[in-house]
Amino acid sequence: MPPRRYNPDHRRDALLERINLDIPNAVAQALREDLGGEVDAHNDITAQLLPENSHSHAVVITREDGVFCGKRWVEEVFIQLAGDDVTLTWHVADGDVVTADQPLFEILGPSRVLLTGERTALNFVQTLSGVASEVRKYVNLLEGTHTQLLDTRKTLPGLRTALKYAVLCGGGANHRLGLSDAFLIKENHIIASGSVRQAVEKAFWLHPDVPVEVEVESLKELEEALKAGADIIMLDNFDTEQMREAVKITRGQAQLEVSGNVTIDTLREFAETGVDYISVGALTKHVRALDLSMRFR
């Protein structure tokens, strides 16, 4: 069973297991959106203008620097559209740094299928590469500190595991995958439970092997969470002086996570206070796609 204290390796393994189930479903949903509600390439009426027996060779390039992510989603798009009739040749792997004008992969197959799958495939890889690229910028700023970058549950609907995978490819780590794999006790939970101690004790009783995290908004609440035995304590909207004081008070009794008011400009300053984790919702909420293009040869 996983340890109660947060374990990035366990979270990673759980995510990769979920991904195996989620990719086919996510791709099928995206294709249905594009093809009139069913995964049928014949519903692309513009592609029907091409001869049925026409075959083409295309290459996908990046127009800007970044970090690549999304290989399996691209493969799944063309598997669902054409089975083995499309051949993909890869020049990069997930997590690779890419530079402007670099070829990423090549596609050989029926011209109609290549055109039908183009936008769906690029939507996935541009979105995931955009997240991985942004995460890498944050991770690079943490170099030399012991602080680890975490994502959050603030993800685009339907793309939770995909976006969290992109965070891994960028060098970050995953917070909770969902509501079932860790406790995160916030203000309303505490009010409804009666106290921090009561909430934490109930969590330990319900699932002794699951991490228990408590969100606090003051140093007083921090001390209450420590006394209750929380594994992880989230410092919500603390300033840097409060963060340093929290590190002194905690003395390794729990892991500390910073959340709120985190930007690429404040990240390093927060990390240098000595906290264990910094979580950033914007990584998977404010997504900027990487600029990619597919060109027929």
What is the meaning of each model-derived region?
Residues 2-228, 232, 244-249, 255-257, ...:
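Acidic/glycine-rich phosphate/pyrophosphate-binding loops and surrounding catalytic core
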Residues 293-297:
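Active-site loop ensemble at the mouth of alpha/beta enzyme cores that anchors a bound cofactor
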Residues 237, 260, 282:
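Short secondary-structure boundary segments
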Residues 260-266:
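Small/polar glycine-rich anion-binding or flexible loop at a beta-alpha turn
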